[in-house]
Each structure stands twice: as structure tokens, then as C-alpha cells.
Amino acid sequence: MITVSNLGMQFGGQWLFQHVDLQFLPGNCYGIIGANGAGKSTFLRILTGELDSTNGSVTVDPTKRVSVLKQNQNAYDTYTVMDTVIMGNQHLYDVMKEKDAIYEKPDFSDDDGLRAADLEAEFAELGGWEAESDASRLLQGLGIGTELHYDQMANVDPRLKVKVLLAQALFGNPDIVMLDEPTNNLDIEAISWLEDFLLDFPGMVIAVSHDRHFLNTVCTHTVDIDYGKIKMYVGNYDFWYESSQMVQAMLRNKNKKNQEKIEELQLFIQRFSANKSKAKQATARRKLLDKLTVEEMPCSTRRYPFVGFQPERELGKDVLTVKDVSVTVDGVKLLDKVYFSVNRTDKIAFVGENELAQTALFKILMGELEPDEGSVKWGVSTIRSYLPKDNSEYFDGNEMELVDWLRQYSAKKDDVYLRGFLGRMLFSNEDVFKPVNVLSGGEKVRCMLSKMMLSGANVVLLDQPTNHLDMESIQAVNKGLEAFPGVVLLASHDHEMLTSTCNRVIAFQPDGTIIDKYGTYDDYLAWMAERKAAQNA
């Protein structure tokens, strides 16, 4: 159990949160949510003991083993992948290494033999003989093949290092697991595996996340950081959202009724306070008026942008034909004779473990990369707009003010018009004069969305649009794509967005080919599960 008592955290004279009293119980999964800057990661770091709070205390059952998802990908570069995972249980790893060191000594003494015997017993009790096979299962579940298990971490692709550190956090049956954005940089298959793992996990899980599907799937409780407070709700993200909306609606309704009653009483008092026959009634109403209040609506840290794409013209019958496209990058064949056509009602989810293939295809479609073979033909009625995964070329070294940066992509040049689009993306007042090269990752994505909204496109291509965005911005993008009457080509890890937006799935296979299925993303997953079951039968 973890007990949080009168906890408060202050930065620069401002309280992030205070007067926090919570209990986290075994067997539950807690999802921590809140706007960017609300203090989610700070609160988690206080729970892990990495950060001291300004006041209050956190008490963790000392008999329980706590495992934390590490954030420094390069901290284990001198170790093998296997050792890095086993270090998730540091005591087991220390016993294993001490035991191995004794056996490697050239002058093995009687004392060494006695110590080795003790270590062997402890090693067995800690599950040491199953450690490598357990670690291997975790790695394979996350999509890391056995050929990499004994490689040095320094030689491992950064995208896979994230998975290794996640396997480390899950290794060895810890009692409590604390995860900060565990689905970041994971492909959808790995996220699905993680969800299944946590559903079966008997211990306590505390996770910061902005992945709605993940939170809805695994969480039994939701911990919301807002209004300078931290509140715990029983239920998943959707239950929290409905509950919080209901509470706000009730408060607004109560305030409205109280305000109407206040105005009615004030009018009566004003009219009859000087009337002797009504004096007692006026006095009674004045007492009632003193009891009525209109509660101030607290100011939320959540800010909701607006995403809306308005096409300049309707699409014609011919939208896009991709014919036998192949491309090899750095000696790896990413696309092999890929063929598909796009209809004007299509909203396509591009999925698969190989994100490089998705990005390569999008670059080919936008004319930024030449295929080795094949052709791409766009319909004459199409107007395309593109959100790349890597937007650095638009911002790095660019000292233009934000409003001037956007102006270069707009037919209308006046400030009021441009600031209207920036305002939809939460850039207001002095924000519009920021140099674009100092913007955060999330701000840069919101700039790109402003650019897309200006384009009048009837075909939008988005490569991992939710990277760097908070929950509120992700929901805004989701709603914008759902409402968009044109064609959507979407590569994303966001299960909720794919399911609610798309009516077709194109899945990239390891050999560079594709699977093309009409239906929702959930329909595709069900079809894949049936296919796998049939293959294993």
C-alpha cells in the first residue's frame, strides 16, 4: 500500500498541488491524468522517491518491491540487453554477478565455496534459474527478437531501447510498478501486448499516460491533477470524463438557479422594503438572500484547442493510385510492390511495426522521396496537406515570429485572420510573437495543424500526429478528423483515434508488402486474431 498524506508541491512560488491525501491499494491500476504542466510526472517522481515534496509525506510499504520505468535510454549502454532487463530486480542481478565472479576466480578457496553455496541458494529462491527465460518472454512480447537479447545496449536502436527499459520495469514480478508514459514510442502491437500483460498483473500499477485506449483498458482508478488538487476516481478514463462533466454541469445548473433566485429576491426587496405591509416579507427574503451564493467556477489547467479542416472543393472520383511501389532505404526494403487505390470516402489507418515503411510511403506520396519502382498518381481535384513525423525542417534555425511563420503559408496575410487560426491552437496575445525555433514539441505540432487548417486541403496525411500532444489536443485532432469530409491518410499509435476515425486499414508487413482491409481498426484486429488462431490450430 502507498499512503499520501497532506502532500504539496511548490515551484517558483506557485503551488502545483497541495492538501493531497490518497491511498493506493494492491491489485489496482491507477492512471494519472492532467494537462501538460499540471504536475503528473512530478507527482509520480514524488511517489517513486526521486523527488522531495514541499510538504507532506508518502509512505510505501517497506516489504514491497517497487519497479520504476527508467527514462535515460543510454544509462545501460555498457550492459547487454539481457542484463539490462534482469537489473529490473537489482538484488537478483547483484547475487548473479557475485556468484559468477566467484566461479571465475583462479584461486577458488574454501570460503569462496561456502559463499558460492549461499549465493546459489539465494539465487534459486529469487527465481534466478528462470530469469533469462522470463526476460526473454518479456522482450519477445514487446517485439524484440532473440537475436538481440545478448547484444550490447549501445548497439541497439533507440526505438528498441524504450522497449528494453519497459521490459526491465516489468521483470521479476514486482509488487508495485510505476510507469511514466509507457506507451510513448511503442508500436500498436507492443501497446496491445502491454495492455494484456497489465490486465493479468497481480500487483499495483501507477501510470502516467495520455493514451485514452490504454487508460480505458487497464485502469481501475483514475487520478486527476487539476485545479491545484489531486483527486482519485473509481473507474477508467471514460468514467472519469463522464463524472467530471456531470459535476461541472451540476455546479453550472446550481449557480444558474441560485443567480435567478438572487435576482428575484433582490427585486422583491428593492420594491417592497419601504412598504410597511411587506416589511416582514422583505426582511425574510433578505435573510434568505444572505444564504444564497454563486460558487466561482474553478479555473482548470486544461485548455482545448479547435481542429477543423475545411476543404476548398469536393473531391472527384479519382483520388490516388499507388501502383507497384518499391523502395529500399539504407539497404532495407521498406516497400515491396505496394499497390492500392484510394476512394473519396476513405479514411485509412496505416499500421504495422515498421514505422519507417509508413514514413517512407508518406514521403513518396508527397513527392519528397523517389520510389525505386512503381508510380503514384493523384487525382486532379486533390489538394493535399501533410503533417510529417519529423517537422524539424520547418523550425530548426528559423527565428521568424510565429505569426510571420504562418503568414508564408496563407493566401490572406492580415494579422487578424492569421491570429484567429493561431488562437484555435491556443496561441494568444504575446505567444504569436515567439520565435518558432524555441517552441516546444507540442507547440510545433499545433503550428503544423494551423498550417494544415489554412490549406483548404481535401486530402490530409498525418504521420504520428499525437506525438508530443497532450490529451486535450489529441481529442481535438480526433474530433477534427472525424468531422472532416475529405480523405484521411493516418499513421498513428492512438488506438482510439484509429478506431473512431478510420474505415479502412492498410497494415505494413515485415517483408514490405501490405494487408488492405475495409472496416474499423477494431474489425481489423478481430480479423487478425481469427487468422492467427486458425494458423495455430
What are these regions (language model features)?
Residues 251-265, 271, 276-287, 303, ...:
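ABC ATPase nucleotide-binding domains
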Residues 25-26, 276-280, 301, 344:
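Short low-complexity stretches enriched in small and charged residues
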Residues 103, 241, 270-273, 290-293, ...:
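A structural signal for long alpha-helical coiled-coils and helix-turn connectors
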Residues 285-303, 347:
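ABC transporter TMD-NBD coupling linker
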Residues 298-314:
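Short, flexible cytosolic linker that couples an ABC transmembrane/permease module to its adjacent nucleotide-binding
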Residues 1-255, 309-537:
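ABC ATP-binding cassette signature C-motif
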Residues 136-142, 267-271, 287-292:
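Short amphipathic coiled-coil heptad-repeat segments
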